[in-house]
Amino acid sequence: IDSFLDANLVFSREHQVYILSIESLSEYTYDRMRSAYEFYLDGIESALSKSEYISGNDLTLADISYVCDFSQFLREGKYQEILKNQGFKIISQDIKDTHPKSINHLLNLSELKEFSSIMGSYLDWYKN
């Protein structure tokens, strides 16, 4: 779990910089975020190919942290026009094809009462 949480912190730092600068995004920041996204989700895909949850066969802090932090990153979907006007696309737009285990895990967990009672309809635009 510790190594996942370390990777999660790095990803979270990158997505905070990305989201906070999204209205005047540099190519450097966008490319950094894209690299962090791919590295992070490649790790999630690998973990989920071995077990039902990120860190084994039971729900752990790794899964909870993933839902919270990755959902925050997905706010980029609300900035599609702003990104497009700057010549960028939503980094996560192909997630269902490139990282299907990751998005399915997120959406499945978000349906659990413990998550849905807090998240509400936050992820609805990714469910289609």
Sequence positions of predicted segments:
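Short active-site alpha-helical segment characteristic of glycosyltransferases
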Residues: 66
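C-terminal helix/juxtamembrane-tail motif
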Residues: 120-128
